Regions:
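Residue-level detector of functional hotspots within protein domains
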Residues: 5, 15, 28-30, 56, ...
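Non-catalytic beta-strand/loop surface segments
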Residues: 6-53, 115-137, 145-146
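C-terminal regions of mature proteins
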Residues: 79-146
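M16/insulysin-pitrilysin zinc metalloprotease superfamily fold
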Residues: 10-11, 33-89
């Protein structure tokens, strides 16, 4: 899922560049993916003076990718970038210890993610894309500072 979300809205994506250059977002913009027993959730978050416009742009970008699909070269580049980020995360002792604890309590091996990540294909990403990011199951939540 992280590969999919990074291709759509990561810092090197067309969407991010367009929103940032248009001053609709700042560098706090990003995404998260949550999952648990019986649920999952994608969250796009950040600061904006026009959150409705940002939401419209995100929905529009998802729609464009539904029509055009994802480029194999962009997929491979994103996959390598995120794999490298996973490896760099191993240099952080506190983060590694946290990941090991989370994996242990989930009954998993912290290094299994590396093996799984290496086997992900563009077809896998397209399959999950077909099942997720439905605009009819989305909501915009805005927290005003006042």
């Amino acid at each position: 899922m992280e590969i999919l979300l990074d291709m759509i809205s990561g810092q090197s994506s067309e969407l991010y560049k367009r929103l940032f250059d248009g001053k609709l977002i700042n560098n706090s913009f990003g995404f998260e993916y949550f999952t648990g027993f019986g649920y999952s959730c994608v969250l796009f978050a950040g600061e904006s003076n026009d959150p409705k416009k940002v939401a419209e742009e995100i929905v529009g970008e998802i729609g464009r990718f539904r029509e055009t699909g994802f480029d194999e070269t962009a997929f491979e580049r994103t996959k390598k970038k995120l794999y490298g980020r996973m490896i760099m995360g191993m240099n952080d002792i506190e983060g590694l210890a946290n990941n090991m604890a989370v994996s242990y309590f989930a009954g998993e091996d912290v290094f299994t993610d590396f093996e799984i990540f290496k086997t992900v294909t563009l077809d896998d990403v397209n399959d999950i894309f077909k099942k997720t990011l439905d605009k009819n199951r989305s909501v915009l939540s805005v927290i005003n500072p006042n």
